[in-house]
Amino acid sequence: MEPETEGPPPTIQVTPLQQMMASCAGAVVTSLMVTPLDVVKIRLQAQNNPFPKGKCFLYSNGLMDHICICEEESKKAWYKKPGNFHGTLDAFLKIVRNEGIKSLWSGLPPTLVMAVPATVIYFTCYEQLSTFLKTKLGENETRIPIVAGIVARFGAVTMISPLELIRTKMQSKTFSYKELYQIVSMKVSEDGWISLWKGWAPTILRDVPFSAMYWYNYENLRRWLCEKSDLYESTFMINFTAGALSGSFAAVATLPFDVVKTQKQTQLWTHEYCKFPEPLDMSTWSIMKNIVADRGFSGLFTGLIPRLVKIVPACAIMISSYELGKGFFQQQNVESR
């Protein structure tokens, strides 16, 4: 009598609440690990080209890019502190030594109010959609990560965009809830409800293709690495590696949309803050044509290395932390049976 072949262990599902908790923990870990890289980059930029009042710049906490408006003429703002840095490593060391290690996370708390909920919505929606589609199409259907990634990212960006707009407006002044309501009401009455989603289109154009490519490559790379390692369940290193590689592929492929998004959003907010009339044509296609005309096709791939330095560790840390959290809850669910 032949021995029975051992199959994969049954998959222990985690609840939506547990998925939310795992993604929340992963989001916090990612932001704590990645934010110092962007803080140092911004400090170096401000040292070489000081930000004038009304200047917009991007701040990334590893989860989202946030538009920040330079409000203060003095050197009180964290990005205007003098440093006399000579390179990235020197900036790290001098900031820690002269200002304290907490300065590496300057500006982080206000952005987490948006970034953590967005990440929780995104990952939980992806998991729920994937589970639902697998029951309809089968476990090995390759289109599932693409569809789930597109829908989840579209929903997360759409839900968070109005809140991010409000956060950007509140940078210059602390508003009461009543004042905030009046500002939003005035904005809606002047420009309509659609005005609350200013900057939504370029974000969708970059993030939705990124999400589709990322999840498709991640799920397939993880499965392939497990097969090569003769494992049924992925390890922390497999998740980390698959996340890093998938993030790098998606970052390169969507770089032109990132260049357009950055330029469009900074122009929009600079014009709004300085009360300049907006250019008549700020469509994505128009901005792309202007970039190609000024700098050639290579202009659409400006900033590839900085984008990879930001995206690759963020994707690797986020997905491996998230899967680690899910594994913890799966173990808890097994023990509670």
Curated annotation (Swiss-Prot):
The keyword Amino-acid biosynthesis does not apply. GO terms for molecular function: glutathione transmembrane transporter activity. GO terms for cellular component: mitochondrial inner membrane; mitochondrion. It catalyses: glutathione(in) = glutathione(out). It is found in: Mitochondrion inner membrane. Widely expressed at low level. Keywords: Membrane, Mitochondrion, Mitochondrion inner membrane, Repeat, Transmembrane, Transmembrane helix, Transport. SUPFAM superfamilies: Mitochondrial carrier (SSF103506). The keyword Mitochondrion applies. Solcar repeats lie at residues 14-132, 140-224, 234-328. It is a multi-pass membrane protein. It holds the Pfam family Mito_carr. The chain crosses the membrane at residues 20-40, 104-124, 146-166, 200-221, 240-260, 299-319. InterPro entries: Mit_carrier, Mitochondrial_sb/sol_carrier, Mt_carrier_dom_sf, Mtm1-like. One of its GO terms (biological process) is import into the mitochondrion. Its main location: mitochondrion. Signal peptide: none annotated. Belongs to the mitochondrial carrier (TC 2.A.29) family. Probable mitochondrial transporter required for glutathione import into mitochondria. Glutathione, which plays key roles in oxidative metabolism, is produced exclusively in the cytosol and is imported in many organelles. Mitochondrial glutathione is required for the activity and stability of proteins containing iron-sulfur clusters, as well as erythropoiesis. This is Mitochondrial glutathione transporter SLC25A40. It comes from Rattus norvegicus (Rat).
